[in-house]
Amino acid sequence: MDTEKLTTMSRDAVTAAVRLALTKGNPTAEPVHLLHAMLMVPESSVAPLLKAVGADAARVDGAASAAIDKLPSSSGSSVAQPQLSGALARVLADAETRADKLGDQFVSTEHLLIALAEVDSDAKNILASNGVTTAALEKAFNDSRGDKRITSAESEGGESALDKYSIDLTQRAKDGKLDPVIGRDSEIRRVAQVLSRRTKNNPVLIGEAGVGKTAVVEGLAQRIVKGDVPDSLKGRRLVSLDLASMVAGAKYRGEFEERLKAVLNEIKSAEGQIITFIDELHTVVGAGASEGSMDASNMLKPLLARGELRLIGATTLDEYREHIEKDPALERRFQQVYVGEPSVEDTVAILRGLRERYEAHHKVRITDSALVAAAQLSHRYITGRQLPDKAIDLVDEAASRLRMEIDSSPEEIDTLRRQVDRLTMEQFAVEKEEDPGSKARLARINSDLADAKEQLRGLEARWAAEKEGLNKVGELKTRIDALRTEADKHTRDGDLAKASEILYGEIPELNKQLDEASAAEEDSQGKSMVSEEVTSDDIAEVVSAWTGVPVGKMLEGESEKLLDMENRIGKRLVGQQAAVKAVSDAVRRSRAGISDPNRPTGSFMFLGPTGVGKTELAKALADFLFDDETAMVRIDMSEYMEKHSVSRLVGAPPGYVGYEEGGQLTEAVRRRPYSVVLLDEIEKAHPDVFNILLQVLDDGRLTDGQGRTVDFRNVILIMTSNLGSQFMADPSMSPEERRNQVMAVVKDHFRPEFLNRLDEIVLFDELSREDLDKIVDISLDKLNRRLAERRISIDVSAAAREWLARTGYDPVYGARPLRRLIQTTVEDQLARAMLAGTISDDQKVSVDMNQAGDGVDVKGEAPVSA
């Protein structure tokens, strides 16, 4: 026979039979080899067909293996490639004849099985002994496949290539397996309009990842099922083509094209009854292409142009530009339908529509405030992703976290279990003692253990009852959802009596049970051990886990912290009350929602002499806002003095070295969008740097070298400068005169459009002698914290503190001389003493004035008491 007429599975079965004969050393491949090989293929339709006629496939396979073992065999290196026996050749010829009579274009494994039952051989005897006859097989085969015919090498047992390489979305909609689609009416209507055209009726959905392109197609499938579509689309099948399955396992050249051609022929022969959907449409360009073969897009073009294939595509803007637009012949066959990101209000509506599905899945209750919080917080805090996808993910993860907490033991039970374990171990240890004290202790332990076990049993019973109540609510919701799907099916089938029975009988009864169970849960919520409600707090915790922003910064506690901002930062930063107040006011305006949400949280320029706390305020601000001092991006602008170095901030342009690395500023903010950005010594930067910063200050965004938009809306931008510091140290000027002089210098150096975009220009005052006293205390506290790891404590006398403040005071250089003084006088002496062994761990150290009164002495005292 012509082996080209065998289906892929039949060809594989014959090849496996020959290989089996070679392995066993048989000179020829017999029908029993083929029978055994067909039963060894997991995807084969042979085993189900045998089952349909009442035979046991495993028993048939065992008999075939036993028959193969009885065949003549030879061993050694001289074993030749087995040939097909005469009986097997007759089986193949008989199968081909049967296929032709049945109108099949290819010979499947079912045809081979029927032929094995017909042609005289050991295989026929095995099948007959198991009650398998040709007539029974033919009847079962025809019943299973109906009017389907094998029209391609990929078809098997009447299974169409389309069913094999696609997912029927309309069937999934009938089965209630698709999530409800809320909104998107205009996009679905536009898709329906394009599909109703005579030619080029192929819409392509274009939009950012996560905006709901696939949901539009699922919405169309649901409308087709309900009949809520134009007449030209009523009763149509909407199938999603699975290109990955089509390419997977295509071993031979032309096999992929053969599979795709079979699918396309089926769609074409359906005469418009099938609408095809390809997600990630750009994958058809180049799919299956190899030397001398045609890719999928070129095979689709003729059908698309003639209107014989109604295809819906979905892809992102970038992929469309990169793949589809490069092929004008393919692009012109599609009509673009843009799918934009929904608003926060629309996202809340979408979440409300999905709530029931997620409640049933996680068996928890999701409050409306949680849905609103998910939409608002994801829009505000999660950048780089689109609504509604990111909001749905928030709700899903928050519900998942709560479900895990419900399934885990509550803290009270965990504590009691550990207590029972500890008392049990103590009981075993004390039981061996015979003295009266131990016996009294044992009695006390036994009493405590009995009480703990009794308490634990009560809590475990209560917890089990609460879990049962929660699970009951979830199960009721799942049953109601399944009944609604069943009612829809009966309505479509015209069985209105059954649909009415479900809608007006079974569902109301279940709803009543659900209300009772929910009411019981709500009554016990105040005293329950586990919560079953997803609230806005849970959503905020997930946002915190994703972005690193502390939860307390987004909920009620934020207002108290913001109102106390000056005092909290003042504990760390001495003096500069005006600077702290200016920064605090700007942050409060932003968090209260009064300032422009499309600009950075705050943008400040700190002016003043060195060592007065400009950088320290930036660190304190990062610690206050983000509970982490390291949440600060520090860039030394003296590194950006040359024109060519400016591009390092946003990344090298395409074609230049370092293009893939991104920019120092943009990458830092992209990875950590909630941070304080400190641009130190801003006056040293090249003027072109300020052109870049204009976009950040005005729009809160910046495009990097790779074309990605980086969001600066949640960044506090701080620039420091020493410009005009000579006037700050002039005692002959009043504060107003000093400010005017400094601002004159600043205006000469920076352009007006740059200065005009800043929230505040803050002038730092010189540190006073009194300020130095406080800084001494702060510096010594830091030293004490560093030494705490070695359990060493330092006690500095008042005289020594006063001397350090007096000697370290320098109005020109600020607080830095004091830091150096503490380093050279206290830390150096301490280090020498520790190395010499005169001061060791767990020891108290005293610091006092020396006898000459021109320095301090560091001495070890008694060990620190435990």
Curated annotation (Swiss-Prot):
It comes from the Bacteria. InterPro entries: AAA+_ATPase, ATPase_AAA_core, Chaperonin_ClpB, Clp_ATPase_C, Clp_N_dom_sf, Clp_R_dom, ClpA/B, ClpA/B_CS1. SMART domains: AAA (SM00382), ClpB_D2-small (SM01086). It is found in: Cytoplasm. Gene3D superfamilies: 1.10.8.60, Clp, N-terminal domain, P-loop containing nucleotide triphosphate hydrolases. GO terms for biological process: cellular response to heat; protein refolding. GO terms for cellular component: cytoplasm. Residues 558-766 are annotated as: NBD2. Belongs to the ClpA/ClpB family. Part of a stress-induced multi-chaperone system, it is involved in the recovery of the cell from heat-induced damage, in cooperation with DnaK, DnaJ and GrpE. Acts before DnaK, in the processing of protein aggregates. Protein binding stimulates the ATPase activity; ATP hydrolysis unfolds the denatured protein aggregates, which probably helps expose new hydrophobic binding sites on the surface of ClpB-bound aggregates, contributing to the solubilization and refolding of denatured protein aggregates by DnaK. The Clp repeat (R) domain probably functions as a substrate-discriminating domain, recruiting aggregated proteins to the ClpB hexamer and/or stabilizing bound proteins. The NBD2 domain is responsible for oligomerization, whereas the NBD1 domain stabilizes the hexamer probably in an ATP-dependent manner. The movement of the coiled-coil domain is essential for ClpB ability to rescue proteins from an aggregated state, probably by pulling apart large aggregated proteins, which are bound between the coiled-coils motifs of adjacent ClpB subunits in the functional hexamer. This is Chaperone protein ClpB. The lineage of its organism: Bacteria, Bacillati, Actinomycetota, Actinomycetes, Propionibacteriales.
